[in-house]
């Protein structure tokens, strides 16, 4: 334990650190295809567009500037890309008041030499040339920054299959830079994952994720990977979230989130677009002085997650003064729907009274008491400066904000016994520190615990473990005790409380177990004896949340029961124990209400389908029995007091519907159809892809395959024999989006097909529907979700499907009670893409019951699918007859086209 007890506390409160690097880098826009004119023009644009004045001063020449080595092993500057050498260009950059950056690799070869086909990069890496190259780059040429990749040191990414040790190589390069005598060189480690805590002693910044690409999914993923790394941005050393894609095609909200979250998380800000083509809107966003101030704040802190909120995240950090009365707050919504988000000032350690300023719009929003909330659009972020009347001592310290000396992302954490951070809904902040213990340095430590006056505190540790595990507690170097705990499950929170003494000022608390695995840690809570404010606040919050849920649509008895349960917990006795119990009960009640509402919605959809099928049936004994079951289900729900009734009633209706539709005594009306979708498992991919073979990718409530051959299938059993129509929304792109030239010329061949037993048909072409075909869709989709006028993402496909696009209608027959449905393609091209959703199945009868079109040749009619989606408006009778085979609704009547 000596290594833990001897740790010194960092006196952070009075220090100011270097800020994250700001500038421009060539890779995103140009790859290795760079030259002197490009770099010079970008440097000039930084100045002319005011970006230099905004703080962007580094001009970084990424991969592509070198061309092997000469006979003596010296680096050769690329003779055609930089015919005048690099020195005149660097001098021009310096003369413009800017700084110049360069690139290399920790191995022999650069990344572009392997992945980009740039053979000129072979042999230009630093390996075996560290000191010589450092003298050349930072002494002779005068570079001020270097990014060092690791393709040449990672066996699968270099032609030599050279495997090097990251720590050894990056440390050696750091030492070579220091040996030049330059102390102002900024050094970026690019290993595409957080390399380990050793890196803060080596580099200025380090990449913590894979390369960014132009797309919302990439931005969202990088933010997610950095949510729980706030403890590792320290002492002016930063987690690098990669270059900025702003101004290159994402939506305005996505660009704002991209820039705003990079600023909140104190990432380096390196513009990645072609500055000669950047628009004024992007320049204005990149130049926002109030967002830049967050990024360049002398405290050099990365915002940490305070709480998760319905799929969104709330982050906060100090600005201007450590533990001062002003904090920056980000409300981040990565979901595909707008949401109301807010925060109680108490939860961000601020007093009741506060002024709020919007940093995107750069305007004061006014004075608020107790809390603040606003609407945050899908993929959006809102960032505020909150200035309060007082600063409170922080009471809750989430484990995902704690530092772990063993943390790294290069090796399997279980193999090397290093801790990680994982999201778990039951945790107070929505995440936990896990896989802790079993080695000396695999522990969690909070190094910034502040006490205004010092003294005795109650420390409550929230933990998760399904087995007996030990925790050693160390406070300011003193071992307080060893505790054995068990919460009773790996998704159950347990807690234990002990008394500790804190000194006035900064303190450090460590939870460890060097000899064996310890429990996962949710958080620690610090309160003084008799301090009930935290527990009162949690209770008020839980009461407010429970009351805010709209119960008006629930059955009267059920809604009244919930109100009575809430009332019972609304006014507990003034003690820690009673507040905690009442809060726990209120949270359970709120969850029960939400489950009831979801179950009610599912029941409603199931009942609607059953009623439609009843209406499509001839009178019969089987129908009377079926209708009787539906009446019973409705009565069950109307008189329900407990939420379980909804699921019971849903199962009752589903079972009765399947029984009825399979009953030979049930008779379908001529010209009508039965909706048999209830026989398909997971037809709409609402939450995942269960029920389907083939493992398609799931997201945005749709399924997809990209860049590959595939088959997704399901066999539906228990069906009547007869005629059916399978409907599914699906699109296929044969190769990279070229605007649909082959589709328009009639030469496009789509290899992907929909199958229903012996029937098959090609999937609809991506190019069969333009985004502009729907004014609503055109208004809602932009940026990377659209390319050349067509949807270009899973979210885009979801929105197009919601607009009624890409229906594929396939008639088929069932002869043995079973129907195999599938989508497959046995060929693929680069960038081919298939996206699909919403399988529906309709039974047309044992015989062909098509209905003649009872309309005049001159009539203009609207055509719908059986589910009410408009296929087309203003069609003639001749045009309707040319529709693909299937079931449609015309003039309120179902018709079948063969």
Q: What is each model feature region?
A:
Residues 262-265, 270-272, 308-350, 379, ...:
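Carbohydrate-binding surface patches
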Residues 323-325, 331-408, 415, 866, ...:
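C-terminal beta-sandwich/jelly-roll accessory domains of carbohydrate-active enzymes
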């Amino acid at each position: 334990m000596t290594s833990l007890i001897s740790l010194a506390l960092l006196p952070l409160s009075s220090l100011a650190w270097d800020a994250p690097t700001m500038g421009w880098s060539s890779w995103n826009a140009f790859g290795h295809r760079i030259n002197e004119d490009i770099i010079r023009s970008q440097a000039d644009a930084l100045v002319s567009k005011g970006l230099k004045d905004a703080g962007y001063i580094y001009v970084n020449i990424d991969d592509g500037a070198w061309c092997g080595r000469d006979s003596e092993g010296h680096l050769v500057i690329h003779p055609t890309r930089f015919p005048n050498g690099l020195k005149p260009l660097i001098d021009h950059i310096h003369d413009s008041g800017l700084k110049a950056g360069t690139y290399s690799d920790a191995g022999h070869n650069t990344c572009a030499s392997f992945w980009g086909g740039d053979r000129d990069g072979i042999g230009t890496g630093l390996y075996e040339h560290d000191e010589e190259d450092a003298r050349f780059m930072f002494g002779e040429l005068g570079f001020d920054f270097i990014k060092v990749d690791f393709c040449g040191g990672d066996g699968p990414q270099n032609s030599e299959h050279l495997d090097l040790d990251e720590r050894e190589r990056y440390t050696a390069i750091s030492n070579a830079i220091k040996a030049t005598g330059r102390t102002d060189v900024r050094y970026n480690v690019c290993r595409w994952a957080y390399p380990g805590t050793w890196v803060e002693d080596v580099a200025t910044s380090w990449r913590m994720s894979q390369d960014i690409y132009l797309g919302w999914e990439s931005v969202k993923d990088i933010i997610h990977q950095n949510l729980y790394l706030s403890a590792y941005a320290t002492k002016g050393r930063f987690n690098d979230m990669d270059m900025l894609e702003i101004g290159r095609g994402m939506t305005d909200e996505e660009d704002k989130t991209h820039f705003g979250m990079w600023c909140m998380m104190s990432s380096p800000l390196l513009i990645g677009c072609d500055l000669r083509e950047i628009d004024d809107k992007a320049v204005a966003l990149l130049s926002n002085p109030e967002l830049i101030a967050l990024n360049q704040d002398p405290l050099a802190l990365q915002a940490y997650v305070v709480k998760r909120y319905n799929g969104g995240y709330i982050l906060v950090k100090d600005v201007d003064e450590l533990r001062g009365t002003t904090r920056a707050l980000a409300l981040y919504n990565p979901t595909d729907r707008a949401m109301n988000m807010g925060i109680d000032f108490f939860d961000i350690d601020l007093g009741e009274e506060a002024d709020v300023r919007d940093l995107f719009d750069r305007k004061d929003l006014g004075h608020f008491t107790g809390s603040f909330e606003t609407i945050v659009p899908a993929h959006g972020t809102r960032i505020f400066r909150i200035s309060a009347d007082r600063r409170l001592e922080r009471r809750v310290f989430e484990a995902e904000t704690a530092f772990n000396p063993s943390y790294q992302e290069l090796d399997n954490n279980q193999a090397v016994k290093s801790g990680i951070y994982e999201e778990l809904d039951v945790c107070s902040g929505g995440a936990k520190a896990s896989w802790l213990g079993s080695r000396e340095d695999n522990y969690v430590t909070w190094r910034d615990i502040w006490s205004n006056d010092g003294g005795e505190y109650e420390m409550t540790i929230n933990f998760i473990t399904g087995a007996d595990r030990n925790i050693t507690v160390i406070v300011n170097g003193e071992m307080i005790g060893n505790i054995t705990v068990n919460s009773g499950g790996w998704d159950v929170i347990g807690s234990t409380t002990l008394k500790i003494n804190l000194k006035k000022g900064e303190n450090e608390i460590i939870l460890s177990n060097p000899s064996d695995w310890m429990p996962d840690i949710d958080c620690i809570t610090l309160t003084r004896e008799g301090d009930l404010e935290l527990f009162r606040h949690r209770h008020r919050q839980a009461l407010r949340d429970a009351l805010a849920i709209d119960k008006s649509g629930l059955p009267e008895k059920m809604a009244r029961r919930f109100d009575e349960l809430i009332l019972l917990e609304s006014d507990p006795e003034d003690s820690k124990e009673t507040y905690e119990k009442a809060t726990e009960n209120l949270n359970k009640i709120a969850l029960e209400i939400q489950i009831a509402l979801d179950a009610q919605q599912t029941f409603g959809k199931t009942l609607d389908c059953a009623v439609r099928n009843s209406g499509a049936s001839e009178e019969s004994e089987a129908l009377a029995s079926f209708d009787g079951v539906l009446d019973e289900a409705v009565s069950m729900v109307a008189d329900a007091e407990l939420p379980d009734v909804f699921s019971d009633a849903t199962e009752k209706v589903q079972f009765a519907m399947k029984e009825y539709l399979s009953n030979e005594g049930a008779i379908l009306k001529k010209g009508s159809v039965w909706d048999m979708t209830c026989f398909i498992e997971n037809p709409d991919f609402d939450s995942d892809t269960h029920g389907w073979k083939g493992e398609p990718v799931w997201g945005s409530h749709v399924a997809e395959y990209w860049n590959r051959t595939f088959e997704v299938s399901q066999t539906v059993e228990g069906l009547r024999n007869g005629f059916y129509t399978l409907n599914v929304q699906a699109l296929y792109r044969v190769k990279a989006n070229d605007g649909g030239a082959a589709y328009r010329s009639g030469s496009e061949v789509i290899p992907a097909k929909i199958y229903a037993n012996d029937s098959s048909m090609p999937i609809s072409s991506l190019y069969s529907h333009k985004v502009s075909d729907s004014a609503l869709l055109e208004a809602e989709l932009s940026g990377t979700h659209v390319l050349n006028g067509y949807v270009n993402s899973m979210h885009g496909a979801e929105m197009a499907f919601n607009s009624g696009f890409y229906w594929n209608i396939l008639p088929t027959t069932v002869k043995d009670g079973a129907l195999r449905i599938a989508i497959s393609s046995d060929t693929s091209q680069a960038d081919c893409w298939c996206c699909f959703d919403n399988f529906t199945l309709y039974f047309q009868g044992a015989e062909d019951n098509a209905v003649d079109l009872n309309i005049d040749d001159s009539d203009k009619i609207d055509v719908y699918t059986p589910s009410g989606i408009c296929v087309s408006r203003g069609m003639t009778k001749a045009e309707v007859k040319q529709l693909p085979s299937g079931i449609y609704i015309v003039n309120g009547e179902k018709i079948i086209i063969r």
